[in-house]
Amino acid sequence: MIDKTAVIHPSSIVEEGAVIGAGVHIGPFCFVGSQVEIGAGTELKSHVVVNGITKIGCDNQIYQFASIGEANQDLKYAGEPTRVEIGDRNRIRESVSIHRGTVQGGGLTKVGSDNLLMINAHIAHDCIIGDRCILANNATLGGHVEIDDFAIIGGMTAIHQFCVIGAHVMVGGCSGVAQDVPPFVIAQGNHATPFGINIEGLKRRGFDKESLHAIRNAYKLLYRSGRTLDEVKPEIAELAEQHSAVQAFIDFFARSTRGIIR
C-alpha cells in the first residue's frame, strides 16, 4: 500500500506489497522490496536499497547508496525470514549498510531513534543500537554488538562481535574494541583501553556535579584500585545505592559476556 501523499521518482522500483507512509519521498533509482514498511515523512535520497523484512519509522533521512535489510554475511545464514527494524528521525548517510538478523541471534537487527550513522558505517546482523548514538565514518560493528544510548563510535573503529558498548561511552577513532566498554567511559586504541570518564558528554546531557563525582568514584574503583572486577563490585553496588547514576555500572556488569576493557 502506497499512501497517496507519497512521492516516488519514476526511475525507482517499489515492489507490490510494500507499505509506504504519508509524505514519504523516494528519490531516483531506489529499490524497495515487497516486505518493506516505511513510515511517514521518511526520505530516500537516491540509489537506496531497502529489502527483506524491514520496518523503517518516521522522518528518517536515508542517503544515496545506503543498503538496508539485505542478507547478512554470517556463513550459517540460509535465507531465513529475519528482520531489520529502524526507529524515527535517524540520519543514515551515504553507503551505510544494515544487515538483517540471524535465527541464532534472535532474528532481528535493530536501530533506535535519533541516531547519526555517518558515511560507510556498517551494522552487522543482530546488532542492537539504542537512541541518539553516533557512528562516525567507516565505523564497523561485528554481529550481535549492542550499542547503548548516547554512545559515540569514532571513525574507522571496529568492534568485535558480541561486544557491549555502554551508554554515554566515547570510543576514539581508529580503535579496535575486543571487550565490553562500561558506561560513561572513554576508550581508545587497538586493543581499546580506558582513558577516563566522558565528563564533557555527561555535562552536556545534564548530569549534576554529585552524579559526576559518584561516577568518577566508581571508575576509580574499577580501574585505579588495582583490584579485580569481582573484588570491587560490592563497593560499586554500595555506591549505586546512594547515587542512582552508578546503577548503570551494576546493570552493565550483569550483561557483560566478553569481560570489560582494561
From Swiss-Prot:
The keyword Chloroplast does not apply. PROSITE patterns: HEXAPEP_TRANSFERASES. The keyword Repeat applies. It catalyses: a (3R)-hydroxyacyl-[ACP] + UDP-N-acetyl-alpha-D-glucosamine = a UDP-3-O-[(3R)-3-hydroxyacyl]-N-acetyl-alpha-D-glucosamine + holo-[ACP]. GO terms for cellular component: cytoplasm; membrane. Gene3D superfamilies: Hexapeptide repeat proteins, Udp N-acetylglucosamine O-acyltransferase, C-terminal domain. Keywords: Acyltransferase, Cytoplasm, Lipid A biosynthesis, Lipid biosynthesis, Lipid metabolism, Repeat, Transferase. InterPro entries: Acetyltransf_C (IPR029098), Acetyltransf_C_sf (IPR037157), Hexapep (IPR001451), Hexapep_transf_CS (IPR018357), Lipid_A_LpxA (IPR010137), Trimer_LpxA-like_sf (IPR011004). It is found in: Cytoplasm. Its EC number is 2.3.1.129. Belongs to the transferase hexapeptide repeat family. LpxA subfamily. NCBIfam families: lipid_A_lpxA, PRK05289.1. Involved in the biosynthesis of lipid A, a phosphorylated glycolipid that anchors the lipopolysaccharide to the outer membrane of the cell. Homotrimer. This is Acyl-[acyl-carrier-protein]--UDP-N-acetylglucosamine O-acyltransferase. It comes from Yersinia enterocolitica serotype O:8 / biotype 1B (strain NCTC 13174 / 8081). The lineage of its organism: Bacteria, Pseudomonadati, Pseudomonadota, Gammaproteobacteria, Enterobacterales. The gene is lpxA.
